């Protein structure tokens, strides 16, 4: 049993509109399993009887944190299997729907006379904080 996200930056992280995919294999043919991802039924469950894939798109109403799941199934005779609630390969996904915010603290130049003015060849330094860990930001000043 494996669970990953289609997040561009990290398959163990998810945000709103990312798809979470659970893939699993049964030891014998089973009827179409019932799968929940984040407490909500999977958008799709498909398979060939022993190899299965369940997918769900995360929404703004999902709970942040480690995404929990359940897999319930019956064999072809109708015997219920033991509910699965954990991966077998240590994969997992953390859902984050909080948009990071940036707060500007200061912009200063190395101008010898005034640190709030800059001329050609002066260097500018911008210091800011974010409300959570972020990737290295791309900073543009004056459209450059």
Predicted regions and their residues:
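A short beta-strand segment in extracellular, disulfide-stabilized domains
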Residues: 19-24, 123-128
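Short, solvent-exposed loop/turn segments at the edges of extracellular beta-sandwich modules
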Residues: 73-83
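Short, solvent-exposed loop/linker segments at the N-terminal edge
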Residues: 7-18, 112-122
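Flexible, low-complexity linkers/stalks enriched in Thr/Pro that connect modular domains
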Residues: 1-2, 86-108
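Short strand-edge motifs at loop-to-beta-strand transitions and within beta-strands
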Residues: 50-56
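Surface-exposed, short loops/turns at beta-strand junctions within beta-sandwich domains
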Residues: 58-66
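Short proline/glycine-enriched turn/loop motifs at strand-loop junctions of beta-rich domains
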Residues: 26-32, 129-136
């Amino acid at each position: 049993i494996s669970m990953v996200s289609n997040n561009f930056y990290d398959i163990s992280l998810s945000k709103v509109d990312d798809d979470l995919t659970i893939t699993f294999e049964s030891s014998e043919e089973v009827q179409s399993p019932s799968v929940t991802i984040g407490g909500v039924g999977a958008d799709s469950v498909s398979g060939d009887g022993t190899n299965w894939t369940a997918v769900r798109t995360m929404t703004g109403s999902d709970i942040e944190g480690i995404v929990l799941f359940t897999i319930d199934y019956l064999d072809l005779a109708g015997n219920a299997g033991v509910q699965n609630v954990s991966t077998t390969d240590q994969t997992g996904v953390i859902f984050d729907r909080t948009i990071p915010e940036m707060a500007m603290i200061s912009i200063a130049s190395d101008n010898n006379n005034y640190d709030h003015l800059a001329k050609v060849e002066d260097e500018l330094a911008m210091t800011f904080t974010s409300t959570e860990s972020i990737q290295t930001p791309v900073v543009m000043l004056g459209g450059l």
